[in-house]
């Protein structure tokens, strides 16, 4: 009996012992996973991961009722798979998959690296797998063994190469598939997924899909979300897509789709979000009139015709409508946007007519009302005067009329108000003073009248005011002088009277001032002479009297028009290039259409005094003759030696953007071959030393056809021949740089132009370029890592400013180390904007077509090879190359990289091996050992920047943020000074 009881007890304890053994193995497997991460900022996650606890007590672990691990959830924990020695290691999928009952594995939204490996296929109980938003490399393994898988998220995971679509064909339970935003090679739509009829969500955007959407898409009848944007999909939208009646979201924007919306598209009545923008679709929108559940509709930049369906006015969920740049006609539905929290409408650049719907801000959340360049008529609705959430209101170039509701002027969040080129009338009321966010006010070409409100000074964010071609009367308020940010004030062609406010001299940012065609009187205020940035001054067609202020002579104006006034006295010699017609009281010996200034009347004097004056005149004449003779001899010698004469000062036009303490002839005389400090595809750069001791850099823009031999004469150096082909490039650089003020962007003082030459005058950078310091002075001096890190961050901030800090983003198009200059304190400055492209402010699609490949070999982004559409991400790629130069010390093109390789391919090829030691070998040997860990972090950022896919590259804002987060290694465990020390301090220690 006792023996029987013993056997029964033994049989009872055996499963318990087995269970304890299994649980112990699970703990060991999880601790092996933990060891992969080493010391991490997410140590809190692993505090409970110790031998003292069971696996079920580990944070992020879920067990079943038997105590077996069924879920690992470590998503969004900032995890990096780097061991205690700092080496990157592959995740131990063999240990993970030894958890035999594991059903859910979530490691998404971390910073995991390395290859995923074939051991993943051993997790054959998995139902849910999320590895998305990481930095993995290499190809994804076949997962045909994961027959129970229902959820697969790999988007933006870093995987590349050929995706194993064939291994998905038998995953019949798969309902969620997200593999977009990865660097796959070009491939057609994966037909293997067309038989996975359980699919409800498919995200394949930005995954290099080419060709057509197959007819077999009709098989996925349970689909609720289909996203195929940012690919190279062509052909028509297949008619079979209308069978996907459960679709709630369809995004196919930024492809090459053509044709019309297929018949039967109306059957997709569950559709809430539909975006087919930036394609070449045609036809009308009639198929959409039955989709009453739409929340967001985007079809901008297509070739759509016909009317906007009136049924849109009854859609009770529609909150965003973007149809700009099509050929749509007819009227907008009156009740459009009245049923829900409508936020956004852009129907600009169509042929729409009728009245503006009045109820789009009924719920009080609307931010954008954009309807410019149509044929709208009628009054602007009163209802929008209460729309306090509006940020941009643009209805210019229509046929609208009537009065603007006074509340519009004072909307507190409005940044851009554009009512130009309509038939509006009435007053600009004092409510404008409440528009604290308003930066641009354009009321030009309307019928507004009344006086200008003095309260406008309350709108102290104003940068641009354009009220031209209206019927405003009365005086120009002195309160304009309080607008410190004002850059452009255009009031021409009105009925303004009185004096020009002296207070305008306080608007020190003014560049453009136009009061032409009014009835302004009295004298031109002397205070205008203090506007050192003023570039254009037009006061023509008024009743101004008195003399031209001497202070205007100091300004470097590209346009000065004082014609048709009542001015008297002589025209200052430095202003003779301006326009002064219609001023009978003006005189000048150098302006042919003005009478000569009188020399003075002779007075009756004694003979002796008369003779004395004659003698004096004779002496002065003799001195002048000798002077001119001497000058002629010197001039002839120089001409014989240099083969050309110096151009006359009056031939030059100077446009200044900052306070100048030099004149143009000081610059021109120094344009000599011996002063050349740089040569480029756009022209030479000269070092110019002024009499004041200041040093400047002058860039001479040349045309491609002109010869660039080593001339000796300053005039020969400036001779460009037929340079009309260069005007666009020169004007692009001036327009860009004149508006830029940033510590990490080179400062432009002025431009100097004449009929056959163009000069740009910059601040001089005494430490040359980053290229010179890295590649041409090795052996003489080595730049330490702290300096390199400071240079990387500073240059990134400069480029971030160009992309994100201006009203209109600027694409540099030639970012390279030789265009990053170093000032006397070793601060980096982005330079050379001859290739810059300013993107139009109101374009949502910010790509542009480049007629020719621009840039420098080794820095050119790969998308130039297959498209003419480039954007800021092309600059990001080039900046990534610069980061690689900083870390490796290598040039972008070197024989060490092998045939047909460059620095990007070289670094990427090593990074795919996921061997930390190999990555460390990429780092410049001159970088101190204690900083190599930080250098490796910067190299990781460089890899992100040089991703083959433009969409996968970060924006410069993100690049700056990542660089700022790199905590210097030397400061982690010591009391040394923080990274905030200037690079100049460090250069004295290292160089």
Swiss-Prot record:
Catalysed reaction equations from the record: L-seryl-[protein] + ATP = O-phospho-L-seryl-[protein] + ADP + H(+); L-threonyl-[protein] + ATP = O-phospho-L-threonyl-[protein] + ADP + H(+)
Record's keyword terms, sorted: ATP-binding, Glycoprotein, Kinase, Leucine-rich repeat, Membrane, Nucleotide-binding, Phosphoprotein, Receptor, Repeat, Serine/threonine-protein kinase, Signal, Transferase, Transmembrane, Transmembrane helix
Bilayer topology annotation: Single-pass membrane protein
Domain Protein kinase, first and last residues per copy: 671-970
Molecular functions (GO terms): ATP binding; protein serine kinase activity; protein serine/threonine kinase activity
Active site: residue positions: 814 (proton acceptor)
Tissue specificity field: Expressed in the endosperm of fertilized ovules.
Ranges for region Disordered: 972-991
Record CDD domains: STKc_IRAK
Positions carrying Phosphotyrosine: 762, 801, 859, 866
Pfam families: LRR_1, LRR_14, LRR_8, LRRNT_2, Pkinase
GO annotation (BP), single: endosperm development
Residue windows of the LRR repeats: 66-90, 99-123, 125-148, 150-170, 171-196, 197-220, 221-244, 246-267, 269-291, 292-314, 315-339, 341-363, 365-387, 388-411, 413-435, 436-459, 461-482, 483-508, 510-531, 532-554, 555-578
Positions annotated as glycosylated: 22, 109, 135, 155, 195, 206, 267, 278, 397, 427, 495, 538
Classification via Gene3D superfamilies: Phosphorylase Kinase, domain 1, Ribonuclease Inhibitor, Transferase(Phosphotransferase) domain 1
Residue spans, topological domain Extracellular: 20-616
GO cellular component: membrane
Reported impact of residue 953 to K: In iku2-3; reduced seed size and earlier endosperm cellularization
Major localisation: membrane
Family annotation (InterPro entries): Kinase-like_dom_sf, Leu-rich_rpt, Leu-rich_rpt_typical-subtyp, LRR_dom_sf, LRR_N_plant-typ, LRR_R13L4/SHOC2-like, Plant_LRR-RLKs, Prot_kinase_dom
Enzyme class: transferase
Biological role: Modulates the seed size by negatively regulating the cellularization of syncytial endosperm.
Protein's name according to its UniProt entry: Receptor-like protein kinase HAIKU2
Recorded name of the encoding gene: IKU2
């Amino acid at each position: 009996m006792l023996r029987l009881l013993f056997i029964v007890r033994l049989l009872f304890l055996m499963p318990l012992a087995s269970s304890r053994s299994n649980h112990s193995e699970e703990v060991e497997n999880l601790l092996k996973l933990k060891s992969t991460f080493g010391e991490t900022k997410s140590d809190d996650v692993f505090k409970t991961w110790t031998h003292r606890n069971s696996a079920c007590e580990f944070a992020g672990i879920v067990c079943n009722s038997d105590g077996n691990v069924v879920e690992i959830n470590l998503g969004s924990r900032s995890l990096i798979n780097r061991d205690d020695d700092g080496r990157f290691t592959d995740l131990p999928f063999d240990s993970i998959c030894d958890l035999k009952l594991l059903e859910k594995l979530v490691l998404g939204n971390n910073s995991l690296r390395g290859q995923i490996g074939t051991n993943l296929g051993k997790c054959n109980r998995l139902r849910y797998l999320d590895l998305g938003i990481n930095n993995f490399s290499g190809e994804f393994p076949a997962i045909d063994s994961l027959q129970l898988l229902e959820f697969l998220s790999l988007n933006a995971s870093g995987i590349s190469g050929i995706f194993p679509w064939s291994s998905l064909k038998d995953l019949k339970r798969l309902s969620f598939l997200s593999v977009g935003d990865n660097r796959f090679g070009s491939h057609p739509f994966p037909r293997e997924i067309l038989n996975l009829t359980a699919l409800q969500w498919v995200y394949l955007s930005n995954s290099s899909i080419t060709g057509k959407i197959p007819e077999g898409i009709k098989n996925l009848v349970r689909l609720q979300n289909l996203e195929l944007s940012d690919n190279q999909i062509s052909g028509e939208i297949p008619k079979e897509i209308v069978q996907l009646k459960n679709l709630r979201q369809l995004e196919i924007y930024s492809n090459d789709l053509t044709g019309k919306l297929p018949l039967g598209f109306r059957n997709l009545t569950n559709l809430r979000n539909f975006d087919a923008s930036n394609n070449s679709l045609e036809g009308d929108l009639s198929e959409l009139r039955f989709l009453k559940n739409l929340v967001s509709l985007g079809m901008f930049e297509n070739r759509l015709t016909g009317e906007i369906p009136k049924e849109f006015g009854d859609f009770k969920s529609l909150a965003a409508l973007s149809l700009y740049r099509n050929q749509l006609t007819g009227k907008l539905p009156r009740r459009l946007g009245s049923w829900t929290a409508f936020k956004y409408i852009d129907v600009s650049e169509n042929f729409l007519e009728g009245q503006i719907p009045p109820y789009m801000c009924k719920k009080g959340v609307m931010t954008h009302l954009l309807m410019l360049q149509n044929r709208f008529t009628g009054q602007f609705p009163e209802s929008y005067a209460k729309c306090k959430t509006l940020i941009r209101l643009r209805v210019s170039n229509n046929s609208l009329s009537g009065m603007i509701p006074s509340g519009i002027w004072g909307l507190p969040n409005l940044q851009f108000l554009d009512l130009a080129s309509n038939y509006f009338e009435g007053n600009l009321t004092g409510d404008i003073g409440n528009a604290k966010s308003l930066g641009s006010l354009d009321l030009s070409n309307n019928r507004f009248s009344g006086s200008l409100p003095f309260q406008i000074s309350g709108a102290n964010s104003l940068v641009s005011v354009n009220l031209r071609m209206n019927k405003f009367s009365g005086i120009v308020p002195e309160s304009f002088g309080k607008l410190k940010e004002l850059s452009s004030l255009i009031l021409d062609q009105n009925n303004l009277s009185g004096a020009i406010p002296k207070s305008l001299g306080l608007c020190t940012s003014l560049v453009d001032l136009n009061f032409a065609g009014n009835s302004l009187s009295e004298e031109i205020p002397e205070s205008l002479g203090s506007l050192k940035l003023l570039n254009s001054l037009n006061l023509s067609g008024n009743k101004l009297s008195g003399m031209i202020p001497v202070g205007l002579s100091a300004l470097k104006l590209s346009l000065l028009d004082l014609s048709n006034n009542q001015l008297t006295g002589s025209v200052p010699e430095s202003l003779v290039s301006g326009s002064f017609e219609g001023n009978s009281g003006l005189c000048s010996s150098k302006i042919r259409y003005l009478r000569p200034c009188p020399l003075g009347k002779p007075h009756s004097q004694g003979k002796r005094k008369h003779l004395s004056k004659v003698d004096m005149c004779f002496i002065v004449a003799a001195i002048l003759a000798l002077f001119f003779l001497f000058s002629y001899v010197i001039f002839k010698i120089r001409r014989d030696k240099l083969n050309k004469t110096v151009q006359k000062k009056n031939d030059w036009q100077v446009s200044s953007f900052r306070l100048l303490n030099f004149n143009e002839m000081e610059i021109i005389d120094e344009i000599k071959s011996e002063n050349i400090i740089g040569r480029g595809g756009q022209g030479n750069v000269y070092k110019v030393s002024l009499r004041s001791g200041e040093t400047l850099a002058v860039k001479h823009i040349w045309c491609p056809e002109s010869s660039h031999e080593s001339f000796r004469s300053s005039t020969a150096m400036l001779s460009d021949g037929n340079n009309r082909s260069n005007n666009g490039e020169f004007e692009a650089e001036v327009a860009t740089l004149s508006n830029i003020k940033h510590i990490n962007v080179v400062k432009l003082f002025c431009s100097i132009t004449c009929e056959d030459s163009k000069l740009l005058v910059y601040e001089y950078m005494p430490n040359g370029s980053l290229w010179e310091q890295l590649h041409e002075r090795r052996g003489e001096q080595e730049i330490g890592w702290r300096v390199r890190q400071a240079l990387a961050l500073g240059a990134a901030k400069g480029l971030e400013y160009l992309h994100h800090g201006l009203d209109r983003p600027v694409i540099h198009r030639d970012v390279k180390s030789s265009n990053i200059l170093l000032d006397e304190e070793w601060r980096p400055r982005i330079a050379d904007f001859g290739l810059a492209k300013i993107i139009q402010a109101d374009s949502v699609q910010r790509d542009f077509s480049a007629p020719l490949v621009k840039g420098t070999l080794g820095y050119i982004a790969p998308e130039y090879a297959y498209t003419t559409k480039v954007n800021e991400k092309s600059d990001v790629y080039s900046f990534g190359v610069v980061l690689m130069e900083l870390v490796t010390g290598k040039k972008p093109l070197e024989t060490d990289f092998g045939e047909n390789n460059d620095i990007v391919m070289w670094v990427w090829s090593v990074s795919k091996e996921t061997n930390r030691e190999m990555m460390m070998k990429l780092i410049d040997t001159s970088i101190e050992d204690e900083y190599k860990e930080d250098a490796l972090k910067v190299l990781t950022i460089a890899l992100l920047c040089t991703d083959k896919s433009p969409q996968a590259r970060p924006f410069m804002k993100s690049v700056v943020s990542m660089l700022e987060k790199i905590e210097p290694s030397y400061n982690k465990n010591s009391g040394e000074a923080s990274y905030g020390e200037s690079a100049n301090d460090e250069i004295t220690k290292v160089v």
